[in-house]
């Protein structure tokens, strides 16, 4: 598929089941709302924290299910209400990937800040080091976006989510336009869907607009971006299988 076909197919997939969109919207709204509730009572705070984590696991598990069904050729969004335990289990692995990459990227950023506070920013070695660290940070960020998909196409083995060389090869085989679009959509999707649940989002809007984003926009972005990334990787994987068979 070319870029236009990928966009068209992803949009059709997203709008194919409006009931699922509503359910996903409710899930994301609950998750982002609970995260912003400030509770002083210790017991209630723990309960809300556990509930927030469960909703995050379900959201990430649903994302994993979209990836899985797309790779298997299914053209309908998966049922959010079917097998919630399975979604939580899948979500747990997705969160491990999230935490793993977040830790690496945070470590690189911390190292750059440490160097900035403890050395001259005009020193040539410092400039070279920060440039290299920035490149590494960018590489890990873009690899994180398709890491769950690479795990899915390799028998769901978690180690494949962290094989940087394989992930970069997938981007290379997508083609420049598809790769750039995948990166932009992936970053946008993460910031508008996952980040608000974790309270990491860069958006600082009024509550009404936050509600609209969580309930109306986030479900669309979740399904569209995940479908687009999955289809892009699926096409690469299918071509490799065809080449091997030929």
Residue map of PLM features:
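A cross-kingdom feature marking solvent-exposed beta-strand/loop segments within repeated
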Residues: 74-80
